[in-house]
């Protein structure tokens, strides 16, 4: 018993915090009108992001060499259906279980509006209503306030998962 306990304790020291809770960005597979791609992003700027304003699709910051705090999700928690923005310790949450629901940020409490899962087709759907997928707005991108070229933004919502929306509903992660 003591050997097992010693192995468990030792394993905690061998796993660094960065390995246990590594940040990844979640990006749309289709780059749409920005070659840098679109990532799930907190509205606002990096560490000054305004969590009360919710989520959007925004130019991925990884082209700058690292994942931005307002786009960094806890990779370990993603495997447990929790979409936690590591730097803010806050969860992605749907505003409702109905089509066109917005994405907001709330304290993580594992309620049904916070449980999302990846499908085999690279779609992110709400477990409480598996017909709804995380979707980037099909309209024209809006210009942001920074970047060169200027960063682009689009709205995010939950829409019916359909093949015709694949370019706006298929996602992946990267370090």
Residue ranges of model-derived segments:
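Generic detector of N-terminal low-structure segments
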Residues: 14-15, 75
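Lectin-like carbohydrate-binding module/patch detector with strong preference for beta-trefoil
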Residues: 20-175
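Sec-dependent N-terminal signal peptides
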Residues: 4-14
């Amino acid at each position: 018993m003591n050997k097992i306990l010693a192995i468990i304790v030792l394993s905690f020291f061998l796993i660094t915090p960065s390995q246990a809770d590594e940040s990844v960005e979640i990006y749309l597979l289709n780059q749409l009108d920005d070659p840098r791609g679109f990532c799930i992003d907190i509205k606002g700027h990096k560490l000054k992001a305004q969590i009360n304003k919710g989520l959007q699709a925004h130019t991925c910051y990884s082209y700058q060499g690292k994942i931005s705090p307002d786009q960094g999700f806890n990779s370990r928690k993603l495997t447990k259906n929790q979409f936690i923005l590591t730097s803010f310790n806050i969860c992605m949450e749907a505003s409702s279980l109905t089509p066109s629901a917005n994405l907001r940020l709330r304290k993580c409490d594992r309620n049904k509006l916070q449980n999302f899962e990846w499908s085999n087709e690279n779609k992110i759907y709400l477990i409480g209503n598996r017909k709804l997928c995380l979707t980037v707005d099909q309209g024209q991108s809006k210009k942001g306030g920074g970047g060169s070229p200027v960063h682009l933004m689009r709205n995010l919502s939950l829409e019916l998962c359909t093949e015709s929306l694949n370019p706006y509903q298929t996602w992946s992660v990267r370090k």
